[in-house]
Structure formats: C-alpha cells, structure tokens
C-alpha cells in the first residue's frame, strides 16, 4: 500500500477541509500522513487516528516562494516533502502554493516533482 504525505496547511480552507479529505482517504483504505500544525490538525481529527508530523509554519499563497522556503524551515510543505525524501511516504499532496511546492521539491529532493493526473483530464484541459 502506498502512503501519501499531505500538506495539511496548504490551501484556502486548510487545515479543516484537508483533514476532512484525509479522513475520507483513510476510510477508503489509503494510508496518509499529515504534515502541519499538530495541535490545530488534532482539533479537526476527532477520534480518527492519522499520523501527524509537526511542521507548524505555513507558506501563504501571497508569499514569495523562494524566500518562504528559505525562511520557513518548519513549513508543512517541507515536512511533507521530507517524508518523501526519507521514504516514509510514496507521494506528496499539497493544495498550497505551487511555487513553494516546486522550490521546496528542488530544495529537499534535488528535483522538480509536480504531477497532475485525473480521469477527467481530457475534460478539464480541453
């Protein structure tokens, strides 16, 4: 079974909606590790048991991605990417800053790692 490292703090409605998605994924049998502010994530998890790595800093959409990656060493996206580097996860998901994800992947993994897949890709991209 593959494990997905999820940037729980990335996205407009994070972490609440991201945690809800992680709970649904777990219920479908998908292994998830959440990266973000542990105390805040726990407040949305309820009784669900999903592993969390505590990376409390958030990179907002309006921040300069390169500067943010340099100054936010405990950011949730870097935490998720570190899980991938350490082979504790097989993939990373983030709904946060694409620029921070791109620069973070170069910083942590030494390569660009962005991928979009969807069964509906033809409809979405036509």
Task: Indicate where each model-derived feature is located.
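Contiguous, glycine/small-aliphatic-enriched amphipathic segments in soluble metabolic enzymes
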Residues: 1-106
């Amino acid at each position: 079974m593959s494990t997905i490292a999820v940037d729980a703090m990335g996205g407009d409605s994070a972490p609440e909606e991201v945690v809800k998605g992680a709970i649904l994924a777990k219920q479908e049998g998908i292994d998830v590790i959440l990266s973000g502010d542990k105390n805040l994530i726990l407040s949305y998890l309820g009784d669900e048991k999903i592993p969390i790595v505590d990376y409390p800093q958030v990179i907002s959409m309006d921040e300069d991605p390169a500067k943010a990656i340099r100054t936010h060493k405990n950011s949730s996206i870097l935490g998720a990417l570190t899980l991938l580097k350490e082979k504790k996860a097989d993939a990373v998901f983030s709904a946060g800053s694409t620029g921070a994800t791109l620069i973070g992947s170069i910083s942590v993994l030494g390569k660009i790692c962005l991928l979009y897949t969807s069964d509906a890709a033809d409809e979405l991209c036509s």
